[in-house]
Amino acid sequence: MHKIGGLVQYQAAPILIYSFVSLKMVAYYGNYSIVIDKVQTLINSLFTGIEAGIGNLIAEGNQIKIEKVFWEINSVRYYIAGFVIFLIYHLVNPFVFLWLGEEYILSNTVVVIILLNTYLRISNGYNASFLFGYGLFYDTWAPLTEAAINIVIAIVCGSIWGLSGVLLGNVISFLLIVCIWKPFFLYWKGFKKRSTSYWFNILKYLAILAVSWYSFILIDKNFITVSPNQNYKSLIFYAVIITFIFGVIFSLMMFAVGKGFRSFTCRFFKIEKWIKI
């Protein structure tokens, strides 16, 4: 039941794109999906081992430890999600341009919607693990509702805005059910407390990403002269530069402001005794 939402997304999207746009656009969208799906699969595989032990953690009954681990995973996922969409946004169109040609490049609006969907799925991929750990399976209506919202919005918006409208179905359905309902349900039935602190921290992560990205834009506009569209060598060089600049800004801000990220980083590098968490 809980896989239905994702199944509908992957099976229905190409059909709806073909119906409201064209078969050619299905292929164009598929080029972007290949790159992004591989990235998402890699990231999810990195967390498989960590999130597999959540059930045992919950069984111990130490609520402080449970929430500490929850926020560590949460912060790292939001960090990775932010980093991934930043790099894809700045690199995917130049890559497609060099790989296939200018005619295969999707509009900036479509790319933003695709990346918004990617960000939501990477950053919120852990909630299900905690819900399963608590044995909270009885919101069986959720995946069915997600699938229904997805299809309805995709049909309505697709008939108006084409590809962008179809993709909005994925974003809005996932946002409402997985990003809003699931955390609320977890706090309500799992942690047995109000979810106010959760939303405060999520807004904090979003603000950190926004400020970091804006800071990079200022640097890019005034100091970076490399064009990623010239050849693969320039693309790689540009990728290295922006990864370093944004990585430093984003990492420092997450470490300074995000308690969960700071806790994970200190534990990962074994520097807890030198850093106040």
PLM feature spans:
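Interfacial transmembrane-helix starts/ends
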Residues: 30, 62-91, 108-111, 199, ...
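Helix-loop junctions and terminal segments of transmembrane helices
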Residues: 32, 36-74, 128-133
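Membrane-interface junctions at transmembrane-helix termini in multi-pass inner-membrane proteins
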Residues: 115-146, 150, 155-156
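Interfacial/gating helices of multi-pass transporter permease domains
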Residues: 15-37, 65, 103-109, 235-238
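Interfacial segments at transmembrane-helix termini and the short loops linking adjacent helices
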Residues: 88-121, 191, 226-231
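Membrane-interface helix-loop junctions in multi-pass transport and translocation proteins
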Residues: 147-179, 193, 217-241
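Membrane-proximal transmembrane or re-entrant/amphipathic helices at the cytosolic face
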Residues: 192-193, 216-277
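Short alpha-helical transmembrane segments in multi-pass integral membrane proteins
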Residues: 33, 74-88, 164-188, 202-206
